[in-house]
């Protein structure tokens, strides 16, 4: 390692808590030359935290093109590691040819974001999509015997309604707004 160099982080595949075991013999027999890519989140965080304290690391570069969507909780942990790195007063730069919502969430922690001239950003937000089947089930004369207690019991709504109840809308909007924050 030279006296001063940036650390390039290029996660490949989804962020996982533990990578899958791949049997080398099965890999050989199948004819594949590599296993499905995954990035161990714990190891990634350890590397970023160590780089923050290493005087030879001058910057953190996030190359996010091959990162697969992994969920908000893992993205938030990765983002917290980036924030800790920034306390070392070293710049963080993010780059991708295309930013999905998760990639842009991570890039937003950087000091600078670069996008390919022919690239794009796709932000969809967080939402809840459910199908409702009451009319179809009525036509099929399907009958249900449902017992429920309380207002926020919406598990059976797709079978008993054609739309979301007000109580369900209120409950779901609370947790979606908490995630979208």
Named regions from a protein language model:
Residues 1-181:
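Small-residue-centered hinge/linker elements
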